[in-house]
Amino acid sequence: MSPGVITVDLHGKTTYQARITVDALLRRAGSSTYWLRLIHSCHAGTALRDFLERTYARHPRVKRLILSPDGGTTELVLREYV
C-alpha cells in the first residue's frame, strides 16, 4: 500500500474487528503513507471513536490523532507532510 492517505470504513465493526483492520493497515502502510482515515460514524454511539483514541494515541507509528469536527472520522497521522 502506498497512497498518501488510506481511508477505511469501520461502520458496523466491533472494536475487535476494528483493531484487526487498523493493525493490519499499520503493518502494511509504507513510507509514503501519511494518514489513515478511519470512518466510524458519530450517529451509532462513541464506542469505536473512544476505542481508537484509547488504543492508538500512544501507538509507536502514530504521531498524533485528529478527530473530525462532527466526530465521525478519526485520522491517524503516521508522518507529517514536509
Walk through the language-model features, giving the residues of each.
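Long, charged, low-complexity intrinsically disordered regions
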Residues: 1-82
